[in-house]
Swiss-Prot record:
It comes from the Bacteria. Part of the 50S ribosomal subunit. The lineage of its organism: Bacteria, Bacillati, Bacillota, Clostridia, Eubacteriales. This is Large ribosomal subunit protein uL13. This protein is one of the early assembly proteins of the 50S ribosomal subunit, although it is not seen to bind rRNA by itself. It is important during the early stages of 50S assembly. The keyword Ribonucleoprotein applies. The keyword Magnesium does not apply. Keywords: Ribonucleoprotein, Ribosomal protein. One of its GO terms (molecular function) is structural constituent of ribosome. Disulfide bonds: none annotated. One of its GO terms (cellular component) is cytosolic large ribosomal subunit.
Length: 144
């Protein structure tokens, strides 16, 4: 018996909608990263992008437990001397709540070209509106 290796052209991709309202950020990101990678499929192959597309709605209603809103920081560099910036998650959630989910999921994907390709399958929106009706996405209920 030979080990099965998925071929990129044979992978069938679905579109899923996940509602982030009332779900903890880390648990949500972990489930989304798993779906984007394709680990929920029997044809999962580590070196092939076998994952599905995920649309996350209501990004502003995701939960950060404990004191993370005030203590957790997002650090980034402007690429100028002395350009290290810090922003608390409270301000990040007020200005760009979709970015908090994107950062959490991106950190759980492989750090290579395949991970960047997988990351492009994540769409995060504020509110319950999205513009992907043509893809006929299925609503996926996560029990977390």
């Amino acid at each position: 018996m030979k080990t099965f290796m998925a071929k990129p052209q044979e992978v069938e991709r679905k579109w899923y909608i996940i509602d982030a309202e009332g779900k903890p950020l880390g648990r949500l990101a972990s489930e989304v990263a798993s779906i984007i990678r394709g680990k929920n499929k029997p044809i999962f192959t580590p070196h092939v992008d076998t994952g599905d597309h995920v649309i996350v709605l209501n990004a502003e209603k995701v939960l950060l437990t404990g004191k993370k809103l005030d203590q957790k920081l997002h650090r980034y560099h402007t690429l100028h001397p002395g350009g290290l910036k810090e922003i608390k998650y409270r301000h990040l959630m007020e200005k760009h709540p979709e970015r908090a989910i994107e950062l959490a999921v991106k950190g759980m994907l492989p750090k290579n070209s395949l991970g960047r390709q997988m990351y492009r399958k994540l769409k995060v929106y504020r509110g319950a509106e999205h513009n992907h009706q043509a893809q006929k996405p299925e609503v996926l209920d996560l029990n977390i």
